[in-house]
Design a protein with these regions (language model features):
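An alpha-helical, amphipathic repeat domain used for nucleic-acid recognition
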Residues: 1-150
Length: 150
């Protein structure tokens, strides 16, 4: 809804902005009533797909904020994720390590050399330092056991 308003306000010329805003509100309310637009469903489904790709909860939250989703809907979505799995960030970080072949997925010889680089990659993807350190300090055997469970 936010992005549609922003787009139409910028693209329509020679019309009062208040008229455009009223028209947009009418159209959006009709679409919401007929369930073509559902922000709750969008935020839940987008969060699930981002978790499957190995994104952190912080990254999911910032993505949904950028899309203009209501803060209460974002809180509900994050709470659902944390209720399903209290340590979701840890498992998402493991998925990212597997995907990017960093941290415990590296060979034992290269792990100390790339430690700072790998921690910074996890931080750029929204993982906090404690989670990143916990993942980076995993043994290769423990990592492989967790990957098999995922």
């Amino acid at each position: 809804t936010y992005l549609l308003k922003k787009y139409l306000k910028a693209s329509v010329q020679n019309v009062k902005k208040q008229d455009v805003t009223n028209l947009i509100d009418i159209v959006l309310s009709d679409l919401e009533k007929s369930k073509f637009i559902n922000d709750q469903f969008y935020s839940d489904s987008k969060a699930k797909s981002m978790i499957q790709r190995g994104n952190s909860i912080n990254k999911i939250r910032s993505y949904l904020i950028g899309k203009g989703i209501n803060n209460q809907l974002i809180k509900d979505t994050v709470n659902k994720i944390q209720d399903e799995n209290s340590d979701q960030d840890f498992f998402s970080a493991i998925k990212l390590c597997k995907k990017k072949r960093i941290g415990p997925a590296r060979t034992e010889d290269n792990r100390p050399l790339f430690y700072k680089k790998d921690i910074s990659l996890l931080a750029r993807n929204g993982f906090d330092f404690e989670t990143s350190k916990k993942v980076m300090d995993l043994d290769k055997d423990d990592y492989l056991k967790i990957v098999r469970l995922l």
